[in-house]
Amino acid sequence: MHSSFPTSLLLLCCALTVSPTVKAQPALDAPNQSVAPENHTLTDTTSQHLLPNALFPLTQKGISQKQWLWGVGHSNVLDTYLSPLEYTGPHFTLLHQSERKARWGRGSVTTHSLYAAHAAYLHSPTDDGKAWDGEFSAAGGWLYNWQVHPRWRLAVGGWVEVSGGFTYNTRNGNNPAQGRLGLSLNPSILVAYRFPFFQKTATAQLQADAQLLGVQFSPSYGQSYYEIFSLGHTSGIIHFTLPGNCPTTRLQALVTLPVWGAKLTLGYLADIRQSQLGGLKRHAWRNTFVLGYTRTLKILR
């Protein structure tokens, strides 16, 4: 009896020690436990693949981004049809642009439109001459997009732009005003970068376009509007434009910040329009600080 009790106690201790090990082993090999980590890994990988679309939702169907900007700046205008002097002064700008995914291009193409209006009150270098200058432009086209990095977007394309405007000089009695009308094809490039901003996402964007070719209305040197519209002397008023005789470019540098549930947009706009047509020179150099807002909308169909 006394010899069998220690032996039984030893066997019982071994059984208690081995039993948890035997019960824990099936838990490590159970199918439902081994699949869970794999599913978790697949979910993380899928999220990484969807990250570019989350950062740049314009590649998703039905997403449209609209932007309204108001600006104030300084203009430098020369129009030798009216005066050999440069007129300078403040100007105001209204800008509206939108972008959405195109119906073609397999998700890599976006449709881009831009509407701009400028109004300036100018004065001569001696401040004894005043002038008003106004211009409106409307452009539309496409951009091909590359997601070069989850935070970076590169787009290249172009658009067709229609522009028109006038300059009115208060000192001139015979020919006080000059009108403008043009059609052009403009290549465009856009670079955008998204970065964290107080636990949200902000966007910095740089876009530039330049006039490649087009047509433009302009009277020739010494040709009055009375001759054109009353006498029918319309020879030479339509000119083909190229970078050599009409170097024109536009540059936008914008930052969009999430503020109080909205998207505040601010930045700089440079609008440089120049021409040398029919023996006349003209330029309008506009430097503008812009402020506005951006909205991202989902189109329901």
Residue ranges of predicted features:
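Transmembrane beta-strands of outer-membrane beta-barrel pores
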Residues: V72-L78, A116-L122, V160-T170, F195, ...
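Short glycine/proline- and aromatic-enriched beta-strand/turn motifs that initiate or cap beta-hairpins
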Residues: Q25-G107, K298
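Outer-membrane beta-barrel "beta-signal"
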Residues: W285-R301
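Transmembrane beta-strands of outer-membrane beta-barrel proteins
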Residues: S64-W70, S108-L114, W152-V160, L185-P187, ...
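Residues that define the transmembrane beta-barrel architecture of outer-membrane proteins
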Residues: E86-L94, K130-A138, W152, A177-P187, ...
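Residues on the lipid-exposed face of transmembrane beta-strands in outer-membrane beta-barrel proteins
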Residues: V72, L94-A102, A138-Y144, G158, ...
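Short loop/turn motifs that connect adjacent beta-strands in outer-membrane beta-barrel proteins
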Residues: P57-S64, K101-T111, N145-A155, P196-T203, ...
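Outer-membrane beta-barrel transmembrane domain signature
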Residues: N174-G261
